[in-house]
C-alpha cells in the first residue's frame, strides 16, 4: 500500500478523521477490503482532499450535506468528527442540516440531526 499518494492521503485522513479510527481501518483491511481502502485513501484523501481549491472546513460542510442527502448516517457520524477537527462549529453543522432539510427533504435532515445530537452528546460527555 505504500506510495506517495497513499501516504499523503493517509496523513490527511488521519488529521481529519482521527488517527485511531484510520489506523484501525487500515490495519483491519484484508485481501478483500484492502483495494477499497487503498482507493479511498489515495484518491479521496490523497487527491481530492489535498486539492487547494477548498479549505478543509468547507469540504467537511459539503460532505455533511451530501451524506445527509444520500441518507448515510454512519458516514455522517464519521464526518461529524472530521468537521469538528476541521474547525466547524456546532452552529455550522446545524446550518447545513437546515439547508439540507429544504433542498434534500426533512426526513433526511432529521436522520442526520439524530446522528448529530447523539454525536454531540458523546463529545460533550467526554469533556465533562
Question: Residue ranges of each PLM-predicted region?
Answer:
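Mid-chain, well-packed structural core segment of small domains
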Residues: 61-64, 68-95
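Substrate/cofactor-recognition hotspot
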Residues: 106-110
Amino acid at each position: 500500500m505504500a506510495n506517495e499518494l497513499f501516504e499523503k492521503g493517509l496523513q490527511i485522513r488521519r488529521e481529519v478523521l482521527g488517527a485511531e479510527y484510520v489506523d484501525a481501518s487500515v490495519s483491519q483491511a484484508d485481501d478483500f477490503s484492502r483495494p477499497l481502502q487503498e482507493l479511498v485513501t489515495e484518491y479521496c484523501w490523497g487527491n481530492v482532499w489535498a486539492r487547494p481549491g477548498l479549505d478543509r472546513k468547507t469540504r467537511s460542510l459539503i460532505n455533511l450535506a451530501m451524506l445527509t442527502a444520500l441518507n448515510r448516517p454512519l458516514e455522517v457520524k464519521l464526518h461529524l468528527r472530521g468537521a469538528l477537527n476541521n474547525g466547524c462549529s456546532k452552529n455550522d453543522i446545524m446550518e447545513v442540516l437546515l439547508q439540507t432539510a429544504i433542498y434534500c427533504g426533512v426526513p433526511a435532515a432529521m436522520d442526520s440531526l439524530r446522528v448529530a445530537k447523539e454525536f454531540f452528546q458523546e463529545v460533550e460527555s467526554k469533556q465533562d
